[in-house]
């Protein structure tokens, strides 16, 4: 996209569903709220009332993720194996929660981009590392496009590197 992007593991101890982790493009000199605010002008209750002059300057991230999913690495898909609409999209590893009553994450998500911009949505792409009973057997860490266009995902839960290939029509 020509822009700098990042994924952020937001703060803990505000509950199961706060604060959302996120993926966003980075604006030079931009203020994303830390440590006083999150997701726009929402005060962290531990800093309530501090720095009111910054409240309206907080940039809202492009894509909000489930809280505590621990987005660790992302790549922009530059292969040709997957359907054409995946070209340039973000694939991000979600390592998984450690401090929620119900686990979340443990997957790879796809963030569709249009003209280098995110719409705010993401899609589950590679799942199954978390069983319906809540047992974890894998934790995605790294994600990269292989020379053949497949997606490689490292997993420190099982000690594996997974290759995701597309075999359908393009």
Please give the residue ranges for each predicted region.
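Beta-propeller domain segments
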Residues: 1-126, 132-138, 164-170
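Blade-level signature of beta-propeller repeat domains, shared across WD40, Kelch, NHL, RCC1
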Residues: 144-170
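C-terminal structured "cap/appendage" subdomains that terminate the fold
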Residues: 129-149, 153
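Short alpha-helical basic/polar micro-motif
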Residues: 72, 141, 159
């Amino acid at each position: 996209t020509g822009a700098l992007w990042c994924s952020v593991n937001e703060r803990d101890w505000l509950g199961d569903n706060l604060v959302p982790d996120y993926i966003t493009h980075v604006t030079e000199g931009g203020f994303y709220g830390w440590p006083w605010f999150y997701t726009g002008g929402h005060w962290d209750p531990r800093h309530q009332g501090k720095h009111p002059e910054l409240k309206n300057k907080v940039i809202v991230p492009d894509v909000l993720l489930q809280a505590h999913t621990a987005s660790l690495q992302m790549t922009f898909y530059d292969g040709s194996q997957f359907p054409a609409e995946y070209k340039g999209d973000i694939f991000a590893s979600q390592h998984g929660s450690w401090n929620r009553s119900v686990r979340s994450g443990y997957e790879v998500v796809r963030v569709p981009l249009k003209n280098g911009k995110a719409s705010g949505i993401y899609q589950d792409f590679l799942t199954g590392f978390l069983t319906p009973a809540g047992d974890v057997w894998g934790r995605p860490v790294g994600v990269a496009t292989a020379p053949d266009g497949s997606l490689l995902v490292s997993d420190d839960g099982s000690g594996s590197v997974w290759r995701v290939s597309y075999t359908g029509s393009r």
